[in-house]
């Protein structure tokens, strides 16, 4: 199917099958379409509503075209990458969580970008910490193997995305590309905590990840709009484990955590975000530490290091008390600049 046919189909509210969507997305990502065609297709697809099959096919195309990071094993390999777009301006929770997971013995293939909707994206806060983002896939692989964490800067691994950047910026509305980033980890991490910007995406995205052969995943969105586990409210979860998907809700009280005020962990820029992370990593008690423990605990659980979410949070709290997450941040900063 070519893009002209696809535009007509989506405008008529017709879903594309996996093969059709593969053809269209491949033509977009290999520069065979015009900006006007890309814009028309993305808006038509968004208005129709993207299906699980369409998102899965698109993710497969992006994965195939990505500059990959090769690892000797994917045991305990996890990503903590969300869609962003919650608009609440909190510090970089999933980025902080990654260092806690590494300190717990996990392998974190952290996929991320600069800020799109927040005041500070994962790349922005890592850069503020002195980390070099522009390192080779080989060095990223070495860091994951030796330190337990590597950061994959999305533009460096998804160069095919350049064909869609112009139309996406000009449209300035959410499209399928808002969910594709976290679905296209260049190290093929089989385990994942993926936050999404809307509750309606939680279960469908878990089904997409099932179709992409993920091992253990939690897709989350909180009652207060976070694409993370919230420390202040209920979080909706779709968990993929043993090829089955279960949906449920969790609340910080379920794990003996106090409800926290999200206003206290807002960050106006990358420097403020880093300051909150450094405080939590130094052992300071408070909302920042608790929300990191909650989210890192989930990632430790899906990585396979522990058998329950509860155990993951306990492990995360131990790490935040002993300073080893800061050690991982320091080690990665040094290695990335070597």
Regions found by a protein language model. Give the residues of each.
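Active-site-proximal loop->helix
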Residues: 114-131
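Helix N-cap / loop-to-helix initiation motif
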Residues: 17, 34-35, 51, 94, ...
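N-terminal glycine-rich anion-binding loops that anchor highly charged ligand groups
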Residues: 1, 10-55, 64-72, 291
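A general structural signal for well-ordered alpha-helical segments in protein cores
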Residues: 3-4, 21, 38, 55, ...
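Active-site cofactor/substrate anionic-group-binding motifs, chiefly glycine-
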Residues: 49-112, 116
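Short amphipathic alpha-helical face segments that pack within enzyme cores
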Residues: 40, 96-100, 291, 295-298
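Glycine-rich anion-binding loops and their surrounding alpha/beta cores
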Residues: 9, 64-67, 90, 105, ...
């Amino acid at each position: 199917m070519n893009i002209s046919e696809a535009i007509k189909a989506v405008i008529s509210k017709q879903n594309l099958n996996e093969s059709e969507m593969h053809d269209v997305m491949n033509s977009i990502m290999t520069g065979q379409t015009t900006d006007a065609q890309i814009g028309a297709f993305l808006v038509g697809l968004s208005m129709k509503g993207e299906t699980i099959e369409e998102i899965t096919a698109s993710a497969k195309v992006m994965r195939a075209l990505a500059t990959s990071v090769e690892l000797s094993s994917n045991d305990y390999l996890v990503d903590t990458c969300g869609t962003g777009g919650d608009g609440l301006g909190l510090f970089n929770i999933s980025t902080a969580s990654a260092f806690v997971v590494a300190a717990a013995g996990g392998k974190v293939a952290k996929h991320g970008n600069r800020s799109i909707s927040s005041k500070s994206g994962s790349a922005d806060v890592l850069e503020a910490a002195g980390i070099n983002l522009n390192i080779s896939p080989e060095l990223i692989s070495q860091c994951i193997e030796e330190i337990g964490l590597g950061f994959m800067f999305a533009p460096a691994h998804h160069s095919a995305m350049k064909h869609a950047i112009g139309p996406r910026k000009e449209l300035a509305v959410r499209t399928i590309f808002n969910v594709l980033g976290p679905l296209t980890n260049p190290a093929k991490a089989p385990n994942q905590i993926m936050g999404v910007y809307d509750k309606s995406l939680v279960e469908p995205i878990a089904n997409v990840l099932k179709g992409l052969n993920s091992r253990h995943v939690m897709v989350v969105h909180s009652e207060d709009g976070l694409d993370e586990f919230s420390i202040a409210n209920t979080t909706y979860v779709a968990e993929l484990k043993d090829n089955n998907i279960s949906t449920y809700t969790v609340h910080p009280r379920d794990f003996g955590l106090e409800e926290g005020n999200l206003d206290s962990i807002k960050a106006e820029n990358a420097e403020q975000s880093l300051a909150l992370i450094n405080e939590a990593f130094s052992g300071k008690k408070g909302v920042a530490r608790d929300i990191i423990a909650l989210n890192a605990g989930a990632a430790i659980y899906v990585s396979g290091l522990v058998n329950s979410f509860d155990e993951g949070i306990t492990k995360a709290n131990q790490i935040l008390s002993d300073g080893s997450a800061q050690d991982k941040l320091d080690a990665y900063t040094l290695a990335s600049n070597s």
